[in-house]
């Protein structure tokens, strides 16, 4: 089964690219391929001139730091055993040499940017509404200050009244 065939695009810095199509056409698969969550069976994938399909540790590290994804289901994408602070700090722990205090400061700053309160830092995902969980997922996707954020229907699971608020 071919999920994607003949897909080609260039994303310019500072621009938004929307991939539109009917259910099952491969939009989510494309997002997972771009982040290498799934490995392409063919084709090419370049980021800033680097072939991301080569098994080059530098290219893999670059991809992890500069290309992030926000999944459409915040219920399934947040580890229920970790507190919000841990969830947000994890990308920094893996990809930077920041101290524990620096990671905490960055996590708290990002929480403020997405409209979460300081006291939410020590709470678990199940303690939040769908809109708040999606804000946590968005915050996690932005923690490494990526160049590219792939948003896989980031508000599809939310009530219409909450969608605009989360997107803003």
Model-flagged regions — what are they?
Residues 1-168:
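ABC transporter nucleotide-binding domains
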């Amino acid at each position: 089964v071919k999920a994607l065939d003949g897909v080609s695009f260039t994303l310019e810095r500072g621009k938004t690219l929307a991939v539109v199509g009917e259910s099952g056409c491969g939009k989510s698969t494309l997002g997972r391929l771009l982040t290498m969550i799934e490995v392409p069976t063919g084709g090419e994938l370049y980021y800033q001139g680097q072939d991301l399909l080569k098994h080059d540790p530098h290219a893999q590290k670059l991809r992890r730091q500069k290309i992030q994804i926000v999944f459409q289901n915040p219920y399934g994408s947040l580890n229920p055993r970790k507190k919000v602070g841990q969830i947000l700090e994890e990308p920094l722990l893996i990809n930077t040499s920041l101290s524990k205090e620096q990671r905490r400061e960055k996590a708290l700053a990002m929480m403020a940017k997405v409209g979460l309160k300081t006291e939410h830092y020590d709470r678990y995902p199940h303690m939040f509404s769908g809109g708040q969980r999606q804000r946590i997922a968005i915050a996690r996707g932005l923690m490494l200050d990526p160049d590219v954020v792939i948003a896989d229907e980031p508000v599809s699971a939310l009530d219409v009244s909450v969608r605009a608020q989360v997107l803003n």
